[in-house]
């Protein structure tokens, strides 16, 4: 996408998938990971990343599986999978605990990761946070015509 390039770009391996990421800012600075929302990619942060880096952070962003330049796996994509992807990214690439800032879906992934791996996440900035009821399983419903009496 034109105008969405920023920072150094590379890939990392998560399970059997290739995942895209980018970063900017000095390596010795505190780490801040930006997570995009549904239908976006790490390029979403093009107008923010350099300013955040100038404020004193090493800024990272990755494309969640199924988005941007990361692999598009077949099958079900869900918050737990994306949280495992973020955990892998924090361990393999960032290499130290980080602040996670997410937009919509990215907020949910950041919060989930903070719950399961508080050793990797210093804090989460959720802007905005989607409705948490989206995590609840939907009740199994059957059409009235398929019910048996």
Regions found by a protein language model. Name each.
Residues 1-2, 127-149:
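Helical cap/lid subdomains and adjacent loops of hydrolase enzymes that gate the active-site channel
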Residues 22-69:
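Conserved HGGG/HGGXW glycine-rich cap/lid loop of the alpha/beta-hydrolase fold
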Residues 49-52, 76-78, 116-119, 126, ...:
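Glycine-rich, phosphate-binding/catalytic loops in enzymes
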Residues 44-46, 70-76, 135-137:
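Conserved catalytic-core motifs of eukaryotic protein kinase domains, centered on the activation segment
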Residues 6, 10-17, 22, 54, ...:
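Active-site loop/oxyanion-hole signature of alpha/beta-hydrolase fold enzymes
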Residues 6, 14-16, 26-27, 116-120:
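A generic fold-level signal
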Residues 46, 87, 111-115:
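Short, hydrophobic alpha-helix immediately C-terminal to the catalytic nucleophile
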Residues 93-136:
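Conserved hydrolase catalytic core segment
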């Amino acid at each position: 996408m034109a105008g969405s390039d920023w920072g150094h770009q590379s890939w990392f391996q998560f399970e059997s998938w290739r995942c895209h990421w980018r970063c900017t800012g000095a390596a010795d600075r505190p780490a801040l990971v930006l997570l995009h929302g549904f239908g976006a990619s790490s390029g979403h942060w093009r107008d923010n990343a350099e300013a955040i880096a100038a404020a004193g952070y090493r800024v990272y962003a990755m494309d969640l599986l199924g988005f941007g330049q990361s692999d598009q796996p077949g099958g079900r994509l869900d918050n737990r999978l994306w949280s495992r992807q973020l955990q892998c990214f924090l361990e393999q690439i960032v290499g130290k605990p980080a602040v996670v800032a997410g937009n919509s879906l990215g907020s949910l992934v950041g919060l989930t990761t903070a719950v399961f791996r508080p050793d990797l996440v210093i804090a989460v900035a959720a802007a905005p946070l989607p409705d948490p009821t989206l995590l609840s399983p939907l009740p199994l419903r059957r059409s009235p015509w398929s019910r048996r009496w």
